[in-house]
């Protein structure tokens, strides 16, 4: 007799099966266990359970349901931009071959990453605004924390510079404000590094500036002439980026414009439909 195939478990509509959600509090996202974890048959929503280690001792470990307090703390500590709290690699839509290659490389980085190992390659995503670079960075940090318990941190370059200046004004030593950046397993900097370089820890980067020789794409900051990445950061730092990173071009249409046009098209269609069904005046 053929055994019946067990019915697939329904995926939670709130968390999509991840077991956690992000709640926005002021200007940051706080990870919290989803209500669906209360029904976990292993930990009953506690997030921790006892398991035997390789020596036969009972140890307290995090449950895979999503309610593990340590994992929630790691996710909160990512400091992801609030607009990108729900962005995942699985939800990244690649509209061009370059975006597809970048997505595959981002996924491979997560799959192959070994916590604590030194000498792992860094990544630098190069692309015009709106092509999904921050989405990739956020999705990678999120998966690394959720799947592998990796300590990560997202920093926006110019805000980081502001924090550094503030630290100096308050009399902090360079070691005091650099230590949090040195300690994390993976650091993501949006918009361009020697403290990470010397520690042998990988860094995820994104920039709007093109590599030298890139055709059909240029970028210039307000009031400045167009520059490529080497001109922007200088030959020394550009050379170090080549040594540290695999450089990936994330080329494609500006997704902010694409989504804006799609919203306008939907609104126009809705208006036309409403006018077509409106009763005629007598």
Which stretches of residues belong to each language-model region?
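Walker A/P-loop nucleotide-binding motif
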Residues: 117-137
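Short glycine-rich substrate-engagement loop in P-loop NTPases that contacts/grips substrate
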Residues: 97-106, 141, 145-184
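Interdomain "pre-motor" coupling segment immediately N-terminal to P-loop NTPase/helicase cores
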Residues: 30-32, 36-81
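Conserved adenine-nucleotide phosphate-binding loops and their immediately adjacent elements
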Residues: 78-91
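N-terminal nucleic-acid engagement/recognition segments and initiation subdomains in replication
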Residues: 1-50
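Residue-level preference for the first positions of well-ordered beta-strands
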Residues: 120-124, 152, 186, 202-204
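N-terminal pre-Walker A segment at the start of P-loop NTPase domains
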Residues: 90-114, 279-282
